[in-house]
Amino acid sequence: MISPQELIERITSAANYHDCIVIVREKTQANLRWANSTLTTNGVIAERSVTVIAFVEVEGGMASGGVSRTDVAAHEIESVVKEAELAARGAGQAPDASELAKNISVGSWSEKHQATGPDVFARIAPALGDMFTRSNADSIELFGYAEHSHISTWVGSKGGLRLRWDQPVGRLEMTGKSHERSRSTWEGVPTRDFSNVSIPDVDAIIRKRLQWQGKKIEIPAGRYDTVAPSGCVSDLLIYMFWSSAARDAYEGQSVFAGKDGAKTRIGEKLSNHSVNLYSDASYKGLESIPFISATSSGPMSSVFDNGLAQTRTNWLTDGSLTALAQTRASARDTELSFTPIGDNLIMEVPGASGSLEDLVSGVKDGLLLTTLWYIRQVDPATLLLTGLTRDGVYRVKDGEVIGAVNNFRWNESPVDLLSRMKTVGTTQITQPREWADDMDRVAMPPVVFENFNMSTVSKAN
């Protein structure tokens, strides 16, 4: 197999058109999986992806087109270079054409991919075995997995881009069931190297929540003050983040479209708290790729922006919308700043403090969630979402959990929820559940939302 660096050099040398950008990603992933409190599988996988993007001069301007492969062998280089050129010429003049970045170097270009492996689980594996033993003794069934990935990205071009980034990421997800599976709960822990993962803590949380479910309380659909753990908050705001393309707003096709003659809602107060929502490639513990590496163009990305820096973008400042996701092309059209979408998402409220337990203790009458799932969009104009609660909804009275209630289908807009935050806790790096496969670097606080709409009772368990 040709090294990523050599492959990029060969492809860009063979490209006899205006410019050529090659993006190579190498990924290794180690995993442990278990069911019924028994380890079922473990292993390591290795993957490579290669994207070749051609930039070709055509009548009226510049065209771009790309092809992606799981790998490119030496004898395939000429054909993949030609395929990219044909894709560009077939696409015609690119509406997002911009001047290409050149002669930028980032990272240790020449180093090999540092593969992850089973050793990353050395510290937690014995503790997992102990947890399985205890759970079997207490008739608790455990299901879940631990996985750790290491992704190396190289971006190179004819124009002198030589960019490299290494991204470690991991997570542990655990579902616990008891009493003939009539009780079920979940816990997830994000990590970069498993040094922060405490299996005894996960065990204690699962046992406590299963115990809470010993008392069942049936309640009707309605609006309830609802304590959302940081993971639930992240699943809601990630969807909002993905819906924040400036061009869509400018064209009146999103919740961020302007009113009363304004093209967008930038500058509008969206929250009743001084919310700061931002992406920052250097955020401690959530470090992410500091340059753009788009394999295709769309509302939020442009291959013409590849190689440009991603630093910090403030999406909300003091509760007001301050930016929407932009390419350079959309920034020109909307006459707004170039604010590329980031690879992490952080929400903070200055002065807010308190753990999830602290927020629960302050609720007189409400609900406590575990997770949200099956989240789908109902109305893009308001970003109304629907979904189900999962793995435990608890009744809170006078600051204490008094039992478990039935599940619900809910209907809410994360944009609207920003203005109905009763209490906000301390921001922490957290584990989304619904979107964890797509967005794995998030820091959010737990939040008490006022009058959260539990629209119908769900029979889901």
Residue spans of the language-model regions?
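Active-site bordering "gate/hinge" segments
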Residues: M1-S302, T317-D318, E400, T427, ...
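Dual-mode signal for accessory low-complexity, basic/Gly-rich regions
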Residues: A262-N461
